[in-house]
């Protein structure tokens, strides 16, 4: 199954620790979505943006671990997008923004570097959450 990561799980080291059997398939951009921070990474629909993501091939065991990591279903909801081909998590509470911790931000920043994703939206999302 396929999973799209846009936050901490863009980082290869972080993903390997929780889902060692996950296989990275590369960095991509999801149209009509933008990155936001609500303390943790989230996304929202916006036709003026594209969301940098990393696609992973994951196992059933990995999906269970991701559910724990994302505090599903309390903090994050899990849905399938793009004709139900990809799993992606988004926050249940879509209200407001909040800056991420420096460590969390650096972890995502490294993930963007790992997959040569454009860091502009990452910086904008952090600035807007401040």
Where are these regions (language model features)?
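Glycine-aromatic micro-motifs
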Residues: 1-130
């Amino acid at each position: 199954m396929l999973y799209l990561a846009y936050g901490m799980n863009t980082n290869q080291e972080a993903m390997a620790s929780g889902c060692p059997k996950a296989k990275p398939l590369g960095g991509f951009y999801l149209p009509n979505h933008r990155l936001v921070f609500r303390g943790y990474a989230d996304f929202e629909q916006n036709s003026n943006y594209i969301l940098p993501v990393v696609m992973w091939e994951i196992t059933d065991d990995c999906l269970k671990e991701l559910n724990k990591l994302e505090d599903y279903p309390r903090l994050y909801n899990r849905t399938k997008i793009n004709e139900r081909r990809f799993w992606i998590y988004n926050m249940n509470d879509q209200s407001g923004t909040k800056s991420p911790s420096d460590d969390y931000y650096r972890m995502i920043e490294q993930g963007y570097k790992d997959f040569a994703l454009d860091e502009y939206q990452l910086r904008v999302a952090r600035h807007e959450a401040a």
